[in-house]
Design a protein with these regions (language model features):
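Non-ligating segments of multi-cofactor redox enzymes
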Residues: 1-512
Length: 512
């Protein structure tokens, strides 16, 4: 057994209001640069939809994640070494810019400089890639916001598998939920296995997956290999980039920017201890629907004296173990089993988990359209199909989703009877396997959600690091493996790049 620590995240979808504050703050901090205009390390999707980039969940098309072989081993779905080498100059599984969207800005200056005329001047869109005027904006990162497109397009959502999707196109049966997405910082990252240059690595001290900008050569196989499509190619620098989980903040014991600025208090950060020796065994599980339960077995009890002794022997600092004992992620994923992984069938063992959302139930239950099991509504009859949530979070296994939803409903029923009627309804807790202490703690974490409960992040022990971070302090900032310039003048073979036109200057001088 080899114990390692991982900073994990849980998002409570039952409280997400779809405000995009997380997306905007992340964008302003990390990707508001030339070459990354189209990239959103964090984005919020309205499900059901095909997402950003288009149909990212369709691995038959994009070849992301891992696939299990007949002999029980796993390989990246993109192919082995020979297939990657054969396609290294022309990757057939690479999303194009149209699959994301062509980033644009508007000619606001024209509103000030336009001559007098009969009609009011308008700010027309221009591409931030070519600088040319765009006649029509065709797509965007949240184009399907709040079910904004026709159902014929949204029914391509892969989570509709084994569901009669057409009936949910009717107004009376429609449903919606928000899904914030970011890099999963997987225990078994397919992007790292797909990179020909070996530029992607997973940090031992906190599990954050990063791209070494010195080693990256822009082959872009990692983009295809990542099933969540959370790696982006910077066309300015010629390098791939991804969510860095705000590791400078994590090292200082602070939450990520998206978690810090979340309006709905839906994000939780905490430490998980796991057995690194079992990753290959668990990722190779034969039945996809068993992957969720198998991944739970990897996580170790931070209060177990044997685990603590082994963790200290493996170099895990005592402060990290102390944080793991107070981790909200461990409580929600392992203790209470409320949080579930996003698409575990990709076999990457993701570490950003989600609490499934409850559907609007009060009026439906009162009208008799939702059945009741005692004081708890029947979760099989809720507005969001149970099968849809299972396809999204547990590879189609409905039992863990049903258990999580029942426990959320039981907590509400118990607290309602306690606050309104002044009685403790213990029967509703026994039916879902919870104790009074667990429910009171769930209420504190989910409903009250104090800052100190949501974020338990230990400061990094940089004295144990291989590199001297102090020597690079205040040096280059967020550069790209080419000194402090931010972009390289040479291509991957060392030859001088062709001159690039400055898009911002071009926008100012080009005429129609």
């Amino acid at each position: 057994m080899k114990i390692r620590s991982q900073i994990g995240m849980v998002l409570n979808l039952d409280k997400c209001i779809g405000c995009h504050t997380c997306s905007i703050t992340c964008k302003n901090v990390w990707t508001s640069r030339e070459g990354m205009e189209y990239a959103w390390f964090n984005n919020v999707e309205s499900k059901p939809d095909i997402g950003y980039p288009k149909e990212w969940e369709n691995q038959d098309k994009w070849k992301g994640g891992w696939v299990r072989n007949a002999n029980g081993s796993i390989n990246p779905r993109i192919g082995g070494k020979f297939r990657v080498l054969a396609n290294i100059f022309a990757n057939p599984d690479l999303p194009s810019l149209d699959d994301y969207y062509e980033p644009f800005d508007f000619d606001y200056q024209h509103l000030h400089t336009a001559p007098l005329g009969e009609h009011q001047p308008t700010a027309r869109p221009r591409s931030l890639v070519s600088g040319k005027r765009m006649q029509k904006i065709e797509w965007g990162p949240n184009w399907e916001e709040i079910l904004g497109t026709e159902f014929a397009k949204r029914r391509k959502d892969k989570n509709f598998d084994q569901i009669q999707a057409d009936i949910y196109g009717e107004y009376e049966n429609t449903f919606m939920m928000y899904l914030p997405r970011l890099c999963e910082h997987c225990l078994n990252p397919a992007c790292a296995a797909s990179c020909p240059s070996g530029a992607i690595y997973k940090r031992e001290e906190d599990g954050i997956v990063l791209i070494d900008q010195e080693k990256c050569r822009g082959w872009r196989m990692c983009i295809s290999g990542c099933p969540y499509k959370k790696i982006y190619f910077n066309w300015k620098s010629g390098k791939s980039e991804k969510c860095i989980f705000c590791y400078p903040r994590i090292e200082a014991g602070m939450p990520t920017v998206c978690a810090e600025t979340c309006v709905g208090r839906i994000r939780y950060l905490g430490v998980l201890l796991y057995d690194a020796d079992r990753i290959s065994e668990v990722a190779s599980t034969a039945n996809e629907q068993d992957l969720y339960e198998k991944q739970l077995e990897i996580f170790l009890d931070p209060n177990d004296p044997a685990v603590i002794r082994q963790a200290l022997a493996d170099g895990v600092p005592q402060s990290v173990i102390d944080s793991a004992q107070r981790s909200p992620v461990y409580k929600m994923a392992v203790d209470w089993k409320l949080a579930l992984p996003l698409h575990p069938e990709y076999r990457t063992l993701p570490m950003v988990w989600y609490v499934p959302p409850l559907s609007p139930i009060q009026n439906a239950a009162a009208a008799g359209t939702v059945g009741m099991n005692g004081v708890i509504p029947d979760v099989d009859s809720l507005r969001i199909p149970l099968r849809y949530l299972a396809n999204l979070l547990t590879a189609g296994d409905e039992k863990p989703v049903k258990r999580a939803l029942k426990r959320l409903l039981a907590m509400r029923a118990y607290k309602r009877s306690q606050q309104v009627d002044g009685v403790q309804d213990l029967q509703v807790l026994e039916d879902v396997g919870l104790s009074v202490e667990q429910v009171e703690e769930m209420y504190r974490y989910l409903a009250i959600a104090n800052y100190e409960d949501r974020f338990v992040v230990p400061s990094a022990h940089r004295e144990d690091a291989m590199s001297d971070a102090f020597a690079e302090r205040s040096g280059c900032g967020f550069s790209f493996g080419s000194g402090c310039s931010g972009s390289s003048d040479t291509n991957m073979f060392g030859a001088k790049k062709a001159n690039r036109r400055d898009v911002l200057k071009t926008v100012q001088i080009w005429e129609d």
